[in-house]
């Protein structure tokens, strides 16, 4: 495995959590584009080590299946490059993701089949990345993939296409794949932000009928590029999401390439200025930055010592405690610098350090996109407009109620009710926290709890269009210190967009507590304060600071369609809460997407985008399972035989197996109450024990039901429905099969029956599990797995 460090959010400006071990490797095709040394390729491949590791531990039996192969295949000589390219796309270099395991891409996790699948997967990704404006077909790989691995090719290709890792975006070849008419279920998407647009395009390509309801008069959500213009001077100002944080594998970088646009690298140079406008002494700057990072290191060690208790402690409390202990006589300038770094941290997390979880505030660091931080020339609105093209969006439709049930969904917006088979909710976490949308029935308590636990912070901006650039053109950012720690985030950082906006555009950021106070500050007062800072910096240098031609002050906290900026892990929360928020509800009727539903990429534009692709795949899978169930329900007698075949196939790779017991259940639904199917295999007749004490443990009910079968058959399989939690509890029963049978029938009170006795309820469960694992090529022969006694 290629290992990553877990760097902290320390970079000036929007934090760049660089992956040092990856960036130290050679990265081909990241050439500087002509015309400007700061413009870079929007996506690139990487090369590095690829270590193949076959899982074969003491608790796992690696199984080989006929027709798949018994040795590692060789596709080409670029396996190392392809592995690292897959790494930038979010895949482990030599193992499967949880999503792949749930999708059932290989017959068994571990072993030669998995290694070959990974090689094929990486090769397909690499092939598409060579020309991201093309549509890659499965037939393109028939000559390079050995025939005996055709099932793995099917599995890898289907997975990558369905989940949006290849063949996505706005290129013409991809647009051409949209069907002329929808032939599948109808889907309602609430919100036309990046996640909603990504899901809409993917679902439309799958053949679904899609309707997007957007409360605003525009698409994009928290990604908003405003055209500023005055006196024949214009500029494109990103008032919301503005920085592409990492370009290696970033799907939005791929969209930019499909648009034919290069990205502008944000330069690291960021000088700081004191309250009086004078530059901060470089030596003092370095000294305080080192000390600040040391405090973060101490806080990291502290949480390890505290364990779970650190969930209830804030990062701010830990930092302040260490600061007080480590320094007595702190100069005013040093204290101002320390507060500037706190403001920068609050900017990176859109939350006060006093509310960030010490335990998990940086839990997403290991998954950070590698590469530079970049601007898109012309603004990110270009991405939005391209993604919104030909998507049926109804604007100024504020959703009040979402009803979901077994018969479908109903979404109320104003006086109109929209009906569909499924609904995808992509509204920001702030809207969910506010209870702006009523869900009927109410959301599960675990989802309500995670909505409450997660933090949702605030970042505001002052965008200023000047008649000309008066600031230094050799930097893209500069910072300013404040005296009052309560206002440390007020205009603490300036971004120059002049190289990409089309005009002399400067944006001042307002973070932390200051961002909340800024919401009620009159715009004229805000602009006056900013100009006072700028003139204090530049006029002593003999540089005149002109009045801006146009200004815009954001109010994201007061926007009813966002009620904040982006999510963070607050005290009491964890990365698990992102996963819980992402869970579907109502047996595949209500789904959730958005930056607050990904634990890997929260608070990022690309995070929002990939969750839309993720949920499109989940919704398609759910619709497929529902279709299978309907066919079974319409003609149960005709489908009884096919369900028996499905059940036999599923039990060849059970989720749990111990003694004579095998259990299958959904791998996507972690709910302890979700259904599971148990199979008990009795291999020979059992003699009734005459000892009355022993008879108490011999499962009398089972024997009474099956005694006649024992006398006629050498082997019999009996079944029952139970919950996932009951299955897990049964596995923990000690004393062998007899004890488990007694626990099952006497303690749990379940009845073991033949296959036909399971009923149509079990048929529905079987169909759902089978549809969930579509793409898995099961062998025709039975194999034995790991067992415990």
Swiss-Prot record:
Residues 1-23 are annotated as: Disordered. Keywords: Chromatin regulator, FAD, Flavoprotein, Isopeptide bond, Oxidoreductase, Repressor, Transcription, Transcription regulation, Ubl conjugation. Its EC number is 1.-.-.-. Disruption phenotype: Delayed flowering. Impaired systemic acquired resistance (SAR) toward pathogenic bacteria (e.g. Pseudomonas syringae pv tomato DC3000 (avrPto)). Lost ability of dehydroabietinal-dependent (DA, a diterpenoid tricyclic diterpene) to trigger flowering and systemic acquired resistance (SAR). Gene3D superfamilies: 3.90.660.10, FAD/NAD(P)-binding domain, Winged helix-like DNA-binding domain superfamily/Winged helix DNA-binding domain. Its cofactor is FAD. There is a cross-link at residues 287, 693, 770 (Glycyl lysine isopeptide (Lys-Gly) (interchain with G-Cter in SUMO)). FAD binds at residues 195, 214, 216, 222, 240-243, 595, 604-605, 607-612. Interacts with HDA6. This is Protein FLOWERING LOCUS D. It comes from Arabidopsis thaliana. The gene is FLD.
């Amino acid at each position: 495995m290629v290992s990553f460090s877990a760097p902290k959010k320390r970079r000036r400006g929007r934090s760049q959590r660089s992956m040092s071990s990856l960036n130290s490797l050679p990265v081909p095709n990241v050439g500087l584009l002509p015309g400007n040394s700061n413009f870079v390729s929007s996506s690139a491949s990487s090369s590095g080590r690829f270590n193949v590791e076959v899982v074969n531990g003491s608790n796992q039996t690696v199984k080989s299946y006929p027709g798949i192969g018994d040795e590692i295949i060789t596709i080409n000589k670029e396996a190392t490059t392809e592995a690292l390219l897959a790494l930038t796309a979010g895949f482990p270099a030599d193992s499967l993701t949880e999503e792949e395991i749930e999708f059932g891409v290989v017959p068994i996790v571990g072993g030669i089949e998995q290694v070959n699948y990974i090689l094929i997967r990486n090769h397909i990704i690499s092939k598409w990345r060579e020309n991201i404006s093309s549509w890659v077909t499965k037939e393109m790989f028939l000559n390079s993939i050995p025939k005996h691995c055709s099932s793995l090719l099917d599995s890898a290709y289907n997975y990558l296409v369905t989940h949006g890792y290849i063949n996505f975006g706005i290129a013409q070849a991809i647009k051409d794949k949209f069907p002329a008419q929808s032939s599948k279920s109808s889907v309602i998407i609430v919100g036309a932000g990046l996640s909603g647009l990504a899901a809409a395009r993917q679902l439309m390509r799958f053949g679904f009928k899609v309707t997007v309801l957007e409360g605003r008069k525009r698409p994009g959500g928290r990604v908003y590029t405003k055209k500023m213009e005055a006196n024949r001077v214009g500029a494109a100002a990103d008032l919301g999401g503005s920085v592409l944080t990492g370009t290696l594998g970033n799907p939005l970088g791929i969209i930019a390439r499909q648009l034919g646009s290069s990205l502008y690298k944000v330069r690291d140079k960021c000088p700081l200025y004191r309250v009086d406008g004078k530059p901060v002494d470089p030596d003092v700057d370095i000294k305080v930055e080192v000390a600040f990072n040391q405090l973060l290191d101490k806080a990291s060690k502290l949480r390890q010592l505290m364990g779970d208790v650190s969930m209830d402690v804030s990062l701010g409390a830990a930092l302040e405690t260490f600061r007080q202990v480590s320094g007595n006589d702190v100069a005013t300038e040093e204290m101002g610098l320390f507060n500037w770094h706190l403001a920068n941290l609050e900017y990176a997390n859109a939350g006060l350090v006093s509310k960030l979880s010490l335990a998990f505030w940086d839990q997403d660091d290991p998954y950070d996109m590698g590469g530079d931080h970049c601007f898109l020339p012309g603004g990110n609105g270009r991405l939005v407009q391209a993604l919104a093209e030909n998507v049926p969006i109804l604007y100024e439709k504020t959703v009040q109620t979402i009803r979901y049930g077994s018969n479908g969904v109903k979404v109320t917006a104003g006086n109109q009710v929209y009906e569909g088979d499924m609904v995808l909710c992509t509204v920001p976490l702030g809207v969910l926290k506010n209870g702006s949308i009523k869900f009927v029935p109410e959301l599960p308590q675990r989802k309500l709890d995670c909505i409450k636990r997660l933090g949702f912070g605030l970042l505001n901006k002052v965008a200023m269009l000047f008649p000309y650039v008066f600031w230094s053109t050799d930097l893209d950012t500069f910072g300013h210190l404040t005296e009052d720690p309560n206002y440390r985030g007020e205009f603490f950082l300036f971004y120059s967009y002049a190289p990409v906006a089309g005009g002399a555009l400067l944006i001042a950021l307002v973070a932390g507590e200051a961002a909340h106070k800024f919401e009620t500050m009159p715009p004229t007062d805000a602009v006056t304060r900013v100009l006072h800072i700028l003139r204090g910096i530049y006029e002593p240098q003999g540089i005149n600071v002109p009045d801006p031609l146009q200004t815009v002050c954001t109010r994201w906290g007061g926007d009813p369609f966002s009620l904040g900026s982006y999510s963070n892990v607050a005290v009491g929360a964890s990365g698990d809460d992102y996963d819980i928020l992402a869970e579907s509800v109502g047996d595949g009727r209500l789904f959730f997407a958005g930056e607050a539903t990904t634990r890997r990429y929260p608070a990022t534009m690309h995070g929002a985008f990939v969750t839309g692709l993720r949920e499109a795949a989940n919704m398609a899978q759910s619709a497929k399972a529902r279709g299978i169930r309907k066919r079974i329900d319409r003609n149960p007698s005709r489908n009884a035989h096919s369900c028996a075949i499905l059940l036999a196939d599923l039990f060849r790779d059970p989720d749990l197996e111990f003694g004579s017991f095998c259990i299958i259940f959904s791998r996507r639904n972690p709910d302890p109450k979700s259904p599971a199917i148990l199979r008990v295999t009795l291999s020979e007749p059992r003699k009734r024990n005459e000892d009355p004490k022993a008879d108490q443990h011999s499962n009398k009910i089972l024997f009474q039901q099956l005694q006649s079968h024992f006398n006629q058959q050498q082997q019999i399989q009996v079944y029952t429905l139970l919950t996932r939690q009951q299955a897990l509890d049964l596995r923990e029963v000690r004393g062998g099969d007899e004890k488990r049978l007694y626990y099952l029938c006497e303690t749990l009170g379940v009845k073991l029956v033949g296959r036909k006795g399971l009923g149509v309820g079990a048929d529905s469960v079987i169909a759902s599990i089978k549809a969930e694992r579509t793409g898995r090529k099961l062998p025709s022969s039975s194999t034995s797995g790991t067992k415990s006694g």
